[in-house]
Amino acid sequence: MNSLVTQYAAPLFERYPQLHDYLPTLERPFFNISLWEHFDDVVTRVTNGRFVPSEFQFIAGELPLSTLPPVLYAITAYYVIIFGGRFLLSKSKPFKLNGLFQLHNLVLTSLSLTLLLLMVEQLVPIIVQHGLYFAICNIGAWTQPLVTLYYMNYIVKFIEFIDTFFLVLKHKKLTFLHTYHHGATALLCYTQLMGTTSISWVPISLNLGVHVVMYWYYFLAARGIRVWWKEWVTRFQIIQFVLDIGFIYFAVYQKAVHLYFPILPHCGDCVGSTTATFAGCAIISSYLVLFISFYINVYKRKGTKTSRVVKRAHGGVAAKVNEYVNVDLKNVPTPSPSPKPQHRRKR
């Protein structure tokens, strides 16, 4: 295969020698362009030197939302605003806000894609040179660029609270799954930053990848553009969730066995505080419980409105689990039973 590539690529490189400058390398996997250096330069210029990514250090107490009290205040304020707002606006007409909603989703698509590409650039050499176990369990994978990206992703979690504000203003239903997820994810990111867990890149990069697709879909939908891959938005969320569980349970096992049951087989310790390890495991596990609960409600409790609507939807749970975060079942007509097939009489 390599010889075939060389055979067909050689004439191209002879004709356009400048293409050699864009061959990917381990340190620069995106066309030999250092995304981090360009990002550092652009952000430094835009902020007039107030924020220099390459010089960033996460120091608790010196940065916004870097200690527990303001984090809890922000999350509490989020719940007060959305539930108080829903009560205060209950008798008003729904706001349309389609233009702002499009802008919101376009901004979050761009932010998620930027952070994802920057993170992949940092992770490729770590994983290739040192292996996957090193990347998720060794302190050497807790690098300055990645910590900078982790903190920026953490701040974005609070920006994503605006998702729910739109639901309130548009008089959409607020479900426990949606509201809990936003608050819990912000808290999860805080605990992992404080606990220096090297595995942080796994759930963060997967989540960023899903959010690129999800927010882009919401942007297109707000513009009235239908896409064939709608149901894959939630399938990607489910895949992300399963991978998160696998990686995090592996890391928690390594940590727990190393500390408390060293005679059991394990690879070694996983870096990160015990508090961060078990807090992360608890929050991720709660997502598992919520999804299983939804699944049981749809497929095991026959006859409920949720079950009938979801089962009749194209794609079933995979297409509707995320949509049911926002949909108001009271306003969804109960599907009528499918009519019995009529047979033509033979003459």
From Swiss-Prot:
GO molecular function: fatty acid elongase activity
Any Pfam family: ELO
Record-listed Phosphoserine modification sites: 336, 338
Span of the annotated motif Di-lysine-like motif: 344-347
Disulfide bonds: none
Keywords carried by this UniProt record: Endoplasmic reticulum, Fatty acid biosynthesis, Fatty acid metabolism, Glycoprotein, Lipid biosynthesis, Lipid metabolism, Membrane, Phosphoprotein, Transferase, Transmembrane, Transmembrane helix
Record EC number: 2.3.1.199
Site annotation Determines the chain length of the elongated VLCFA: residues: 255
Catalytic activity: a very-long-chain acyl-CoA + malonyl-CoA + H(+) = a very-long-chain 3-oxoacyl-CoA + CO2 + CoA; octadecanoyl-CoA + malonyl-CoA + H(+) = 3-oxoeicosanoyl-CoA + CO2 + CoA; hexadecanoyl-CoA + malonyl-CoA + H(+) = 3-oxooctadecanoyl-CoA + CO2 + CoA; eicosanoyl-CoA + malonyl-CoA + H(+) = 3-oxodocosanoyl-CoA + CO2 + CoA
Broad class of the protein's primary localization: endoplasmic reticulum
Motif HxxHH motif in this chain: 178-182
Subcellular location: Endoplasmic reticulum membrane
Top-level enzyme category: transferase
Residues spanning the membrane: 63-83, 97-119, 123-142, 147-169, 201-221, 232-254, 276-296
Glycosylation site positions: 32
Membrane topology recorded in Swiss-Prot or TrEMBL: Multi-pass membrane protein
Residue intervals annotated with topology Lumenal: 1-62, 120-122, 170-200, 255-275
Annotated function: Component of a microsomal membrane-bound long-chain fatty acid elongation system, which produces the 20-26-carbon very long-chain fatty acids (VLCFA) from long-chain fatty acid precursors and is involved ceramide and inositol sphingolipid biosynthesis. Component of elongase II, which elongates 16-18 carbon fatty acyl-CoAs such as palmitoyl-CoA and stearoyl-CoA to 20-22-carbon fatty acids by incorporation of malonyl-CoA. Involved in the synthesis of 1,3-beta-glucan.
Miscellaneous section: Present with 3510 molecules/cell in log phase SD medium.
Family per record: Belongs to the ELO family.
Name the UniProt record assigns to this protein: Fatty acid elongase 2
Organism: Saccharomyces cerevisiae (strain ATCC 204508 / S288c)
Organism taxonomic ancestry: Eukaryota, Fungi, Dikarya, Ascomycota, Saccharomycotina
